[in-house]
Amino acid sequence: MPEPGGHPVVWDACAQIVAARLMPSFHTRRVVCHPPKAMFDLVADVERYPEFVPLCEALEIRSRTPESDGAEVITATMTAGYGLIRESFTSRVRLDHAAARILVSYVDGPFRTLENHWSFLPHPRGCEVDFFIQYEFRSRTLQMLVGALFDGAVRRFSDAFEIRADRVYGRPTAKVNIGTPLRCTSPGDMKLPRR
């Protein structure tokens, strides 16, 4: 017969499920008219984030480490700010070129949890970009002060990267007919700028 109050493992699992549902998160999947490698490289270029990522004021690379499977791990500290509020946090960014995935895990800062991932899949019109982020601030006060602002910025992330891609790689030529979706002429025709 179970103890009154239930089994601790079951309660822990229930608490994790409830916390996951209450934790702010955002997921989007969209097709962009740029090749997967171009989009991967754009998101992987974390040093440029202060130029276009919402709320990102500064970013400092702490380390770069190649892994045996060909992936690269970057540890970076980002300073995010709005008005008089500034917070810095450190993340571990795993760039998996072979799988066309970028995984970001939280190391230190004002969050209890912060994780996100990107994946870049070939698509007839360019690339299908999948972006997911989940976060929770440690401080309820900070959550109340900047939670809605941060949530709004997170929802603009994928837009910011798509706009940046158009600026860096050029806006792809598209055929638009009334009543039909936007179509790139051909992902193979898109040229990447020389570095």
Show which residues each predicted segment covers.
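Short, well-structured hydrophobic secondary-structure segments
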Residues: 74-78
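Hydrophobic-ligand binding "helix-grip"
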Residues: 50-54, 58-67, 79-130, 134-136, ...
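Short alpha-helical basic/polar micro-motif
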Residues: 37, 118, 159
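A conserved amphipathic terminal alpha-helix motif
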Residues: 137, 141-184
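Hydrophobic ligand-binding cavity/cleft-lining segments
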Residues: 10-71, 125, 171, 182-195
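Generic recognition of short, well-ordered alpha-helical segments
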Residues: 44, 115, 144-145
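Extreme N-terminal basic, low-complexity initiation segments
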Residues: 2-8
